[in-house]
Amino acid sequence: MYFVSNSESKFKELKQMAKNTKYDIQWYKYSIKELQTDNVEQLLRHKVLDAFRKLKRPVMVDHTILEVEAFNSLPGLQTNYFFRKMGNEEIVKFCNYKKEWKAKVVTKLCCCTGKKIIISDGFEEGRIVDNPNISNKGYDWDDIFKPAVDNDRDDVYSKLDKNSRSMRKKAWEDLIVKLSSEEIFFTHAEKYRENIEDLAELICKKKVMLFIGAGISASIGLPSWNKLIGELGEADDFDAEIFSEYGDNMLLAEYSETLNNNENRLQDMFTDKWDIKSNDILRSELEKSLIYKYIMELDCPVIYTTNFDHMIEDYYEMKKKEINRVAVIDDFDNSEQKHPRLMKFHGDMKYKDSIVFTESQYFKRMDYQSFMDIKLQADLLKYNVLFLGYSLSDINIKQLLYISRKRWADNGNKKISYIYTATPNYVQEKVFEKNGIISISGGVADKKIATELFLKDLCEQIKILKKRS
């Protein structure tokens, strides 16, 4: 379970509290913009849903509320902002002026299990000190708040053992009681390992072809599809976020080409940016990429990609390895190949007529009668598929799975396929499983690192199997 926060000290507290429980708390450093509201449940739901959208796995957030009698129970939900603006000394001065020192601190934990949102809390009642001794050891108010209970030495909060008595501890204890009866959508290490072993065995037998999407190119700094569309919009004097509100990506790409009366707009804007001969930064990122290294080490006989760029070909060339690129029918050679065959399923920047980027280009391809579609259908009868660099909601994945199911149904030769996604989706995983698609997700939140680890595990398992044989 990931604790999503900017605060490492809070994470360390929770990590220590969870030490003797079944929960392994990891830290994901991320700043969540807080909702301006006086409804604590609304604020917590906003924070935890923001975190869940980011990670797509069980997450936890917190929020601490200080209520000071002298301020009519403020700062309340806006405690962080309040302390940044006023500081401890000003708060103490005001309490002394009002002669009101009573205060209460509440910490709320909010967990998204992947299925439900669970909220817990813990609180301490006490008072604000009348003579501050600012140590800067604590969190905001820790140096000026004295708990009323179990505090014989009358210490401020920063001097107490938080792991034994804090509001966060009370909230954590409340939370694990509530979670005990809930289903939590964890990734399962045993299942991950089994899938790695099964997939490695198929790869060793040359029974797997790869399908590579935009996430692989994005790992070395090329834009994602959304970012690419945003850049097209900005080139047409739109704010990228406003441009995205006018339709899906293919429609927006169509608009950009129509507005500029230029069917080569994609090539004109990005050919030089995506050329490693003129882009030293991109070349450096590609050369040191572990993801491309492991893809090459898999040594699959066939690779399909919906990417327009040349990163796969360029990487093979850098490493002095041969690969046969097929973007148009003239590239295709029916003779037996000694090297991997790279099928540019949605075209190549080199051939403007081959690219599938706009809405009309996509619908033109929907008849599945091009040489590329026919070859794909033949390959689907021969190989299992491993999808890399796609999200489970990607339109390309849905199209490809439709083709796969149709071809397998027509021939009674259904093959298991695999998709690796750095961000899991429990609901779509179940739907895919029903259709013979096994979803594999790692336990690391960082997408690039997670993909590197998956491919590394796969390559290492392949080496083990080859040594045995």
PLM regions: where:
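Anionic-ligand binding patches
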Residues: M1-Y2, S9-E182
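Short, polar loop motifs at secondary-structure junctions
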Residues: E8-S9, T64, F308-D309, A422-V427
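Short, active-site-adjacent cap segments at secondary-structure transitions
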Residues: F11, L66-E69, S217-S219, H310-E313
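Short Gly/Thr/Asp-enriched flexible loops that form oxyanion-binding sites at enzyme active sites
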Residues: V68-Y81, L222-W225, K398-S404
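Gly/serine-rich nucleotide phosphate-binding loop at the start of the catalytic core
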Residues: S181-M296, Y304, I312, Y316-M318, ...
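SIR2/sirtuin-family catalytic core signature
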Residues: F185-L210, I216-A218, L298, K319-E322, ...
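Active-site-adjacent alpha/beta core region of enzyme catalytic domains
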Residues: R283-K350
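Active-site glycine-rich loop that binds ribose-phosphate moieties when present
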Residues: S360-I374, L400
